[in-house]
Amino acid sequence: MLFRSDVTDGFHPVSHHGDLPERLEKLVKIQKWHMQQFADFLKKMADTPDGQGSLLDHAVFMYGSNMSNSNQHSNYPIPNLVVGGGNGKLKQGGQHLVLPERTPIANVHLSLMQKVGLERDHFGDSTGVISEF
């Protein structure tokens, strides 16, 4: 996939950067492009009226990675964004949550599923829910 005119490499090979500056530079460009696509999408959702709010108010999106450092195949810590109002079921307002080390990402998935009304008590390797949502 062509991310930018100056980055023609695929994401996966670039993510295994070997701490080489030229690969890290490409990785940053690709990740910035990804984030810009997500931001553009969220703006469209926020700008689209839906009932008493916007589509973004009535939805929830999670954006992130399954790796912290893909070069090392490290899974912790994993930065993720949770955006949207979940139809009034999610706390809003710029929270920054730092979960205990080695908290399974499945706990976030399970928590969001429960918040939007899916009756599940387990998902993947979940060990609990995130009450701060």
State where each predicted segment sits.
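Ligand-binding pockets and gating/stacking loops
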Residues: 1-133
